[in-house]
Amino acid sequence: MYGVIFHFLREYVIERHGGKATWDALLKAQGYKYKMYFPVQDYADEEIVNLVQTASKALNVPVPDVLEDFGSFVGPQLLTFYHMYVKDKNMKTFDVIEVAGGSIHDAIHQHNKNRKPPRLSAHREAPDVLMVHYQSHRKLCPVVRGIIRGLGEKFNEKFDIKETQCMYDGADECVMRVTKLL
């Protein structure tokens, strides 16, 4: 897992769930007295899975809900981190999601050929409907839903997100129909 995600997870826990003491408690539960995550380094997927599961138990919130809330937090953060791909100031949520599926994930893979970023693609079915396709061995579709919601909050847009197929139900990929609400 790309280190920037751990960085964002730390910021998420600190901002939304009790501050640095909560983050330190999560690390301690994983057997770390102190741990620093570097944005461009790779870490084992299991490490973030364990952190999220520990957070879920501590917060008494189901893992998918923690992941979706994390996604809503991280969506706007990703705009800042990958600002070079989102140069058009008139871009809105659908535009950003369309760009993310190509340029951003290509850039992640280009820096390290061993990285396995998710496959993400999106196309407009209508001006107010975006079809989002997500595939990853990590099965983090709740994060994708959250990112869409978080970007929507940033751009003052609201969406109805219907998952028409999901990897958790045996599908090869998750497909989300995202409808912009007026």
Question: How does the language model describe each region?
Answer:
Residues 1, 5, 62, 139-147:
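Short amphipathic alpha-helical segments
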Residues 1-34:
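Charged, compositionally biased N-terminal leader segments and the immediate start
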Residues 6, 10, 14, 71, ...:
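Generic solvent-exposed, charged/amphipathic alpha-helical segments
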Residues 16, 29, 58, 154-155:
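Alpha-helical structural context
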Residues 21-59:
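Long amphipathic alpha-helical segments
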Residues 22-31, 67-73, 88, 160-168:
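Short alpha-helical "patches" and their helix-cap loops
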Residues 48-142, 165:
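Amphipathic interaction/junction segments at domain boundaries or subunit interfaces
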Residues 129-182:
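C-terminal non-catalytic interaction appendages of large macromolecular assemblies
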